[in-house]
Amino acid sequence: MQFAVRILKFADGLPNRPSGRTVANQVARSGTSVAANYRAALRAQSRADFINKITTVLEEADETAFWIELTELANLLPAKRLAALHTEAEELTKIFNATRMTARNHKS
């Protein structure tokens, strides 16, 4: 949930011009989706359901990292303001990938 809050604050800080608004909308959507879909994954009805939902979480975390990278490449914000958030998005991507792999390999 805290990642989603940080993403919303990041989105609010983007420039109010077409490129900034585009990135703000996309990163807010994908970044908050990480938290919402993770919550749904925790309530999965089966292992297959959990794997499907955690895959969505993984994809949204990776997409969020993409939008943060694009923000830097497009010079919408200084790189030093993005470093911690980008690192967190990458770490979450790795965590959710490992979670998915464990769930896939777990024998019931």
Can you describe what each PLM-predicted range is?
Residues 1-108:
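Short, C-terminally biased terminal segments at protein or domain edges
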